[in-house]
Amino acid sequence: MTQPLFLIGPRGCGKTTVGMALADLLNRRFVDTDQWLQSQLNMTVAEIVEREEWAGFRARETAALEAVTAPSTVIATGGGIILTEFNRHFMQNNGIVVYLCAPVSVLVNRLQAAPEEDLRPTLTGKPLSEEVQEVLEERDALYREVAHIIIDATNEPSQVISEIRSALAQTINC
């Protein structure tokens, strides 16, 4: 199987952590769309949003998704990539989409423990726990709509990877 694997889900669900380890295990290339975009523009996501607003960032995110999609690649996407209909169809039609699902409490704990998350601009201007709750309520149905596979991401990365591998084996053998 050489189809790209798209990891989707909210901030803090483990897309980058799981994606890097999964790519290594499957001998695939790993790309994080946010990191790729930041390296291309030599700007942080916050700087891009400040300069171009969220609409400009979302347009660049779509271009990044198209640019990094290639066979034998694990792609960790930005949490809001599913907000654009084109992106949802593109991922569904060009690879296998894995939704790393986790409850608000887990996401908030992970985000509070990750100092680099302070570099991300707020989506709502609200306290973190309220923002995560609101954003997840808005996006969960979209994540589920686009996903070929839904994985409980509350477990340790090694367990999440094991569950992804099992689900991929079942998907391929259908």
Curated annotation (Swiss-Prot):
Cofactor note as given: Binds 1 Mg(2+) ion per subunit.
Binding locations of substrate: 34, 58, 79, 139
The keyword Chaperone appears for this protein: no
Compartmental location: Cytoplasm
Record's catalysed reaction(s): shikimate + ATP = 3-phosphoshikimate + ADP + H(+)
Region (LID domain): 112-126
Cofactors required: Mg(2+)
UniProt binding sites for ATP: 12-17, 120
Enzyme class: transferase
Cellular component GO terms held in the UniProt record: cytosol
EC number: 2.7.1.71
Major subcellular location class: cytoplasm
Domain free text: The LID domain closes over the active site upon ATP binding.
Assembly information from the UniProt record: Monomer.
Function: Catalyzes the specific phosphorylation of the 3-hydroxyl group of shikimic acid using ATP as a cosubstrate.
Protein name as catalogued: Shikimate kinase 2
Species for this entry: Shigella dysenteriae serotype 1 (strain Sd197)
Species lineage: Bacteria, Pseudomonadati, Pseudomonadota, Gammaproteobacteria, Enterobacterales
Gene behind the chain: aroL
